[in-house]
Amino acid sequence: MAQRIFTLILLLCSTSAFAGLFDAPGRSQFVPADRAFVFDFQQNQHDLTLSWQVKEGYYLYRKQISITPTKADIAAVQLPAGVWHEDEFYGKSEIYRKRLNVPVTVNQAAAGATLTVTYQGCADAGFCYPPETKTVPLSEVAAAIDATPTPAVTQTGETSKPAAQLPFSALWALLIGIGIAFTPCVLPMYPLISGIVLGGRQRLSTGRALLLAFIYVQGMALTYTALGLVVAAAGLQFQAALQHPYVLIGLAIVFTLLALSMFGLFTLQLPSSLQTRLTLMSNRQQGGSPGGVFVMGAIAGLICSPCTTAPLSAILLYIAQSGNMWLGGGTLYLYALGMGLPLMLVTVFGNRLLPKSGPWMAHVKTAFGFVILALPVFLLERIIGEAWGLRLWSLLGVAFFGWAFITSLQARRAWMRIVQIILLAAALISVRPLQDWAFGSPSAQAPAHLNFTAISTVDELNQALAQAKGKPVMLDFYADWCVACKEFEKYTFSDPRVQQALGDTVLLQANVTANNAQDVALLKHLQVLGLPTILFFDAQGQEQPQARVTGFMDAATFSAHLHDRQP
């Protein structure tokens, strides 16, 4: 008897274990959106809290969260800082993991008032959900006398990394500040400024001279930090507008004009009357005293020379896009500190540490013009796409390395020949994308892609299945916001093995980027949780559930899957 019971248990375990061998490789291991991102809300009079419990291995996109009131007035919602996630197609995006709490201040809500909350997320395994929309009913709330927005709480979980939002870290601001110090408008002024800071006294202890120079630099840094905070705060209010294509194009034009001013095409500075007033205010301060030196530094931060106006404006405009006040203030502080380091050295050690003035200072100014030109390319790349973005980077690289090579020809030193060879090689490498675009290249030819027939509704799908004429059908769901869909397109569908395996298959594709009513109806009808999802139908128009693919597959795996699904 005991042996029979043992045998029965063994058979049951074996059945459970071997059942997994017959599972389809494409069967979804992903949970529905409501389980991946558990949404909840709680209202206490004017205070409303929206919360998401994010399942392990999933994340929400910060920029995809929108909150729209109906019959209600709410304070400006400030989403907490997230963590940074990077992929090949969309670059860096701010995301939330584990748990997200968003406080909302309800200034006034009439009877029947609601909030429409839209959000979207993905799985780390390469599976994205369509945007989810929830309607939050609001309790009736009378208008408060003094309704102020509640500051957003921080996300629990991973540590945010706001500095990663910029293509250059805040440390670059320090290096840019040091570089600006060696432009022709700034470097010759350091000995004069040093004398003013010391109050005309030549015999001061090293410690006293260093202290006065440091105080002057801190005064200058205070002005720049305040500018950074103000601009970042203003950018925070208009952050969504700053991502609009027209605004990005406008910013790109402004950055280009700033770069042209660094090339000497025109001069950009404060009006002379305002500069004169600031200079007179600075001259009234007493040099050699900590208080007077600090005020002189603060005023000096407002007097922008032609060499510093363009880089400062570029940094301020870029900070406005981040909307991060800590990053804005810190970046401008490091920028001012970089400009002040040479001044501190001159004040303590004298002019002997400064390099001699010469044409090289104009070259430094021009080089910063090329640095500023990188910002328009970075902004336009979001609009024009990866291919054209690469061509713009190529054009900028050719221009910079070509200019540097021509400039280096004036040098007489032998070791500069090595530098010239490196610059020439860099220019030749940079020109390759432009060469492939203009003349074509066998190695650079875009791979052939599958020729899909577009469908958008259930009726169109049924009609396409009826017209398949006894052939198997593959239906691919695609959306612009689906990273893995783009990976399928670039790496899998372009593979010759995949194209050969699909030679006798009718190819359909549903683009659900808009996520409108007919898209939602199609997804619901076919029980599609998210993207990428690929469905297969047999010659009779019946879906083969075991062949369904959810999540990304590389070319080899997908090709094997296509062969395995064949009857």
UniProtKB/Swiss-Prot annotation:
Residue ranges of every copy of the Thioredoxin domain listed in the record: 435-567
Any single biological process term in GO: cytochrome complex assembly
Reaction(s) the record says it catalyses: [protein]-dithiol + NAD(+) = [protein]-disulfide + NADH + H(+); [protein]-dithiol + NADP(+) = [protein]-disulfide + NADPH + H(+)
Key words, A-Z: Cell inner membrane, Cell membrane, Cytochrome c-type biogenesis, Disulfide bond, Electron transport, Membrane, NAD, Oxidoreductase, Redox-active center, Signal, Transmembrane, Transmembrane helix, Transport
Cited PROSITE patterns: THIOREDOXIN_1, THIOREDOXIN_2
Annotated GO MF terms: electron transfer activity; protein-disulfide reductase [NAD(P)H] activity
Family under the similarity heading: Belongs to the thioredoxin family. DsbD subfamily.
Name this protein carries in UniProt: Thiol:disulfide interchange protein DsbD
